[in-house]
Regions:
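Beta-rich, blade/repeat-based domains predominating
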Residues: 53-77, 92, 114-138, 143-144, ...
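Short loop/turn segments immediately following the C-termini of beta-strands
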Residues: 84-86, 143-145, 153, 187, ...
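Beta-propeller domains
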Residues: 45, 69-76, 82-110, 150, ...
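Secretory targeting and sorting signals
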Residues: 2-30
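Surface-exposed loop and turn segments in beta-propeller and other repeat-based domains
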Residues: 35-57, 99-125, 157-180, 221-248, ...
């Protein structure tokens, strides 16, 4: 993701803050005096874990997942990261997932080629932030482009890899159209995988906003060493703002996270976080859901995860800040994770994941192509 340094939501976020009765000094105070219930308020340091650039030179790290249990070539406590760009920095052309240990050792978990997709996902390979790990299977969004621009992108697919990094299954069609982000809820022998789709009418609109972004729930069944199978697909969210962008590739619903059955969505284009109730079981779309929070410290929210205390953590595309929002919708803490460029940190942040035992927060820094830790 490479938002223009003058990304429009910078101004929009500030204006929304003023409209909510928050001045810039108030926002600074909120950052300095994090509420006692804040998760990120307990951390005061950031450090580099490792470069995310593998031997083939892939750039622009997106998805971040912490491995919960060892299986195959996946090792407990390690972090897997998907790359969206190739060595020429063309978006929608990255083909690798790297595995990084907490001490910074990096290896290639998977290098996905077009041949491995066997014609079931035309257009090439471009791995998004839609990265999940369920029952030992890695599922990653593939949203490829021929030249780094959304105008030449394809609908893509979800690529299913086993714990050794081998492509075993492809999920495509049935509403999967530009899979931009994902999250999952596991249960015994099954999982609900939520996928944000951002290519519904965006190419034809040629940069204009269309409200056709969707969130799909894929209900998957698992049986031994066989790849997961789709038991059903439900559209649980719809009507999200989306558009193509020459710098950001696309702007649309991005980060997803589930807590107690509620799906939280980073509605990037509208500069807000929304909540879809009963997402794991519902049979109909909730539209864009209810608004949890908007404006304030948000500035084009992208990556999203849920903190151990149940708060929603998002990172901005329009600046280098992380924002923590309580379950009641109050923005309880925020801080800069990157201040490079102008505006500070714009376009640097994307995927994030809570470290084991809540000991910190892993996040990717696209500006430096690194995995970092807030601790």
């Amino acid at each position: 993701m490479r938002f223009t340094r003058g990304f429009a939501l910078v101004a929009a976020g500030t204006a929304a803050a003023m409209g909510a009765g928050l001045t810039t000094s108030t926002l600074a105070l909120a950052s300095a005096r994090s509420a006692p219930s804040s998760f990120i308020g307990g951390f005061h340091h950031t450090s580099k874990v490792a470069s995310t650039v593998p031997g083939n030179g892939d750039l622009n790290p997106y998805g971040v997942v912490v491995v919960a249990s060892s299986q195959g070539r996946l090792h407990r406590g390690n972090i897997i990261v998907s790359n969206f760009n190739n060595s020429k920095n063309l978006q929608g052309t990255g083909s690798t997932i790297v595995q990084i240990s907490p001490r910074g050792h990096r290896s290639v978990f998977a290098h996905i080629t077009s041949g491995a997709l066997k014609g079931r996902c035309p257009g090439g390979v471009g791995l998004t932030t839609g990265l999940v790990l369920v029952h030992g299977w890695v599922i990653v969004g593939n949203f490829p482009s021929r030249n780094g621009q959304a105008a030449t992108s394809s609908a893509g697919c979800l690529v299913v890899l086993d714990s050794r990094g081998v492509v075993r299954e492809i999920f495509s069609g049935r509403g999967i159209n530009g899979p931009w982000d994902a999250t999952a809820v596991e249960s015994q022998g099954s999982a609900a995988v939520f996928v944000a789709n951002v290519l519904n009418g965006t190419k034809a609109a040629m940069g204009k906003v269309v409200h056709r972004g969707t969130i799909l729930r894929l209900d998957l069944g698992f049986s031994g060493a066989k790849p997961p199978r789709i038991r059903g697909i439900t559209k649980v969210g719809s009507g999200f703002a989306e558009r193509t962008d020459p710098n950001a590739f696309v702007v649309g619903p991005t980060g997803l996270g589930v807590r107690n059955g509620t799906l939280y969505v980073a509605d990037t284009g509208m500069n807000r976080i929304t909540a879809i109730p009963g997402a794991v079981m519902r049979h109909t779309s909730a539209g864009t859901g209810r608004v949890l929070t908007s404006g304030g410290g948000l500035n084009g929210p992208l990556g999203l995860t849920i903190a151990p205390n149940g708060n929603v953590l998002t990172v901005n595309g329009g600046d280098g800040r992380i924002v923590e929002t309580s379950k009641s919708g109050k923005q309880v803490a925020m801080r800069f994770l990157d201040k490079s460029g102008s505006p500070p940190g714009a376009g640097a942040l994307f995927g994030l994941a809570v470290a084991p035992h809540g000991a910190g927060l892993y996040y990717v820094d696209d500006a430096a192509n690194t995995l970092r830790l807030l601790h």
